[in-house]
Regions:
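Bacterial N-terminal signal peptides
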Residues: 8-20
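N-terminal maturation segment of proteins
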Residues: 25-589
């Protein structure tokens, strides 16, 4: 009897312990989420515009204090949270998914602290104030699911605070780089136009129109004075250093990637991939030569001849483009085509409802890119997303406009729409907004996000989009070569003394970019250290993941299941993808 009783007691004890473990993990997981929510509450009080960008509308009537004293409080909040996190949450007690969330949260805090201690954007980046001046109001009218009357009232409240933002800019800015200041000047012209006219178009029919006009008029006047300050006082002394330097670049890239790769390893990978893509482009261009240059002999196939062949064929392909005013319409048509193809070919299940709208990029957001995707904010997922495309800037001459349109010709628009829209950013960000983890919805990996978008460009053509059109494939390779070159350019511009002329030569001769596109890319490289490297690093992570999973599963590999397994965890650092995708695929459908 005693033996039987002891055995049964052990069995009961083991069952109780087995049940207790998940309960304890659930409690620890809930504690982590509570700590993160508390962090966000304090963060949003300090950073109202960041709250709006993420979709928390409790502080939509406020804007940040941008004084040096206020920014010290931001850093103190980060340091305090980083110190308290391991004391308040037991990492060992968390479930594995929550452990990943813990690591993401902790890494983000460390990265934020390093950036605050080692960079000086509020003293050196003139553009940063444009975000408060423009996005503080624009986002309320375009990406909030609150009633229109509430959004307009919050706009009016924020507009009253814009003079304080301008005053802070005038106080804080000291010898910023010239390229940052020139972009800010162009964007501020757009901001003036927005407050003089555009804001009323975005606000639509509202009983608050008179109050909105009364609030916008002094803002436009304030910004005109700010424009004079930028042009006449700041620009003549805008001789600050934009290069990050090798040591800071390496550290910042390590924090940005969070993938266990050094800056030197990333650029070495990029240089090897660059050579491979060059060879592939020549193979395609050779097959297209007779289509565009009938009866003309193929150039010699030495290095110079190969590059000349590719350049000539790309030049011929580029002639097939729309007019400037047709860019937005053309992208809308491509969105419809892509969605139909994705559904018909079982690429993945498209999220419903679709919150994405194709719009013309506002003038005050132009200057760095041709298109961007602004998804519904993660904390307001039912708001509208915007796929914005930029027509050529109004101050460009006819030659530069034509160069821009040739760069974004009909074939390149296909690739751009895949990348920014379907199944690229728009689809991925909609999936992310459905993730149950608050930490993953808010703290997103740019490497994952850009890598997914670049991965989809080749994948869609591999699955038959474009019906094997070689001109489209050559355009896709050119677009991908740009992503690879971004990494090389990013590294060389910030870690060496590469001149603008040398960068222009590299982009135009080796990367086959038009002069207009190349000059924009040089400006962007100066203004966004390390971000340009995320495209290639992320793409290689997604590509290698696909290779490994497909080899492991063999004939059981299903493309749709794989894609949805990649999207399911949210935009996590890519080092977690293999573990998470395997776990997802092991579960029944």
């Amino acid at each position: 009897m005693r033996t039987t009783f002891t055995f049964r007691s052990c069995v009961v004890l083991l069952v109780l312990l087995a049940n207790a473990a998940p309960v304890a993990a659930q409690q620890a997981d809930a504690k982590l989420e509570a700590v993160f929510k508390s962090y966000l509450d304090d963060y949003f009080r300090l950073r109202p515009l960041e709250a709006t960008r993420l979709g928390d509308h409790r502080f939509d009537s406020q804007l940040e204090e941008l004084t040096p004293e206020a920014r010290v409080k931001w850093l103190e909040h980060t340091r305090k949270t980083l110190t308290a996190l391991p004391k308040e949450v037991s990492y060992q007690g968390l479930s594995r998914p929550a452990q990943i969330d813990f690591e993401i949260f902790e890494h983000t805090l460390k990265a934020d602290q390093w950036l605050a201690e080692n960079t000086r954007p509020y003293q050196e980046d003139t553009r940063i104030y444009n975000g408060y001046i423009n996005d503080g109001v624009y986002l309320l009218l375009t990406q909030s699911s609150l009633p229109r009357e509430t959004n307009v009232a919050n706009c009016i409240a924020r507009m009253a605070q814009i003079p304080k933002v301008v005053a802070a800019a005038r106080q804080n800015l000291r010898s910023p780089p010239r390229t940052h200041t020139e972009t800010a000047i162009r964007q501020n012209r757009g901001a003036i136009a927005f407050y003089e006219q555009g804001i009323f178009e975005f606000a639509g029919k509202t009983r608050q129109l008179a109050a909105l006009k009364a609030a916008a008029e002094p803002v436009a006047a304030c910004l005109k004075e700010y424009q004079a300050f930028l042009e006449k006082e700041l620009l003549p002394h805008a001789n600050g250093e934009w290069r990050l330097g090798e040591e800071k670049f390496a550290k910042k890239l390590d924090l940005e990637l969070n993938a266990g790769m050094t800056a030197d390893q990333v650029v070495a990978d990029a240089e090897a991939e660059f050579a491979r893509v060059e060879r592939d482009m020549y193979v395609i261009a050779r097959q297209l030569w007779s289509r565009y240059f009938a009866r003309q002999p193929l150039p010699p196939d030495d290095t110079d001849g190969q590059r000349w062949t590719v350049q000539q064929v790309l030049g011929a392909v580029a002639k097939e483009h729309c007019r400037p005013e047709e860019l937005t319409r053309e992208m809308k048509q491509r969105v419809a085509q892509l969605k139909k193809f994705i559904a018909a070919n079982d690429i993945l299940r498209l999220p419903e409802p679709d919150h994405c709208q194709v719009v013309e990029m506002p003038e005050f957001k132009r200057g760095n890119s041709t298109a961007y995707m602004e998804a519904p904010p993660p904390l307001d997922p039912n708001a509208t997303g915007q796929l914005a495309v930029s027509p050529p800037p109004r101050d460009w001459d006819a030659q530069r406009v034509n160069s821009y349109l040739e760069e974004y010709n009909n074939h390149m628009l296909d690739i751009l729409t895949i990348h920014e829209g379907y199944p690229g950013h728009s689809v991925q960000l909609e999936y992310m907004n459905r993730n149950p983890s608050l930490i993953r919805r808010v703290l997103q990996s740019g490497v994952y996000i850009e890598g997914w978008a670049v991965y989809t460009e080749q994948m869609m053509l591999d699955q038959g989009y474009g019906q094997g059109d070689l001109a489209l494939r050559l355009s896709q390779l050119k677009f991908y070569l740009r992503a690879v070159a971004n990494t090389i350019l990013d590294h060389k511009m910030h870690c060496s003394n590469l001149t603008d002329d040398e960068a222009l030569e590299f982009l135009m001769r080796r990367c086959f970019q038009s002069e207009g596109e190349a000059r924009l890319k040089i400006i962007r490289a100066k203004q966004s250290s390390c971000q340009l490297s995320t495209y290639f690093a992320g793409r290689m992570a997604h590509y290698r993941l696909r290779q490994q999973i497909q080899r492991e599963l063999g004939e059981k590999f299903e493309l749709r299941r794989f894609h949805e397994a990649v999207l399911a965890p949210g935009a996590v650092p890519v080092k977690y993808l293999l573990e998470l995708v395997r776990a997802k695929l092991e579960k029944p459908q």
